[in-house]
Amino acid sequence: MSFTIKFCSDLHINKYYPHFPSVKDLFDTNDKFIADICILIGDITHFEVIKFYKKFLQYLSPYFSLLIVVPGNHEYYCNGTKKHSMKELDQASQTLTRDIKNLEILNNKYIDIGDVRIFGSILWSYLPHTTPYRKLPIYNDNYEMLTRNEFNILNYSAKMSLENCIRQSKTDGKELIVATHYSPTFDMYEVDDNNETKDHMNYWYCNNMDDLINEDNVKVWLFGHTHTPYRKNINGTIVMSNPYVSGYCKGLGVNIN
């Protein structure tokens, strides 16, 4: 089965409220049909402004057979006067898939398209104790900002989900496309002999998962978050980012044959 994918991340459309980027702004065509699949890889805007989020997705959805959202960290930011837990924001996001029939939200989940499996995850990064910690407006069930330990639990859960998907996809004979908000590699930064970043602040943006990139059934890995355009073939796996906020390429996409 063959299909086409367009992808982008880090639109941060809250900056344009009440407007948002047009199809002409995002893609190299404004034809009635742009591609089979569009993957939005996080930091589109906040789930707390769910009506604005929905309006943007409803605008985009007719141009694609399938629209996939992989949440980012900013989806869970609470910048208003009211605190919302991550669980509450996840519940709010379910109204999107209820009202937009060709929309899938993938966070530690996958969808099969013929013999290809698409796995999506925020893929929160691991924050070692050597990395300075900064509290973000993301809240747990007690309406307290997430701790370092809670971030690392999210990282562990995402990594386990991805590893299980890679393993199961091999059993099922599926080629795998991975879409994660956080980067799976420190490759765009200066690293040591263990592929670990020399600047510990970069742990806020990336994971050291080059071993998973190298899995033979992982064919494409798309990511966001770093605001750094990136395109590289790593041992046969196409690894790319396409952030709207920096160096965005309207024509960038993936053809799956």
Question: Which ranges hold each PLM region?
Answer:
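Active-site-proximal loop/helix segment associated with metal-binding centers of metalloenzymes
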Residues: F119-H200
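A basic- and aromatic-enriched beta-loop-alpha substructure that forms the phosphate/nucleotide-
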Residues: L66-I138
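Active-site neighborhood of phospho(di)ester-bond hydrolases with catalytic His/Asp-centered motifs
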Residues: F7-S9, C38-D43, I68-N73, E104-N108, ...
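Active-site environment of divalent metal-dependent phosphoester hydrolases
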Residues: H12-H19, T45-K51, H74-H84, Y110-D112, ...
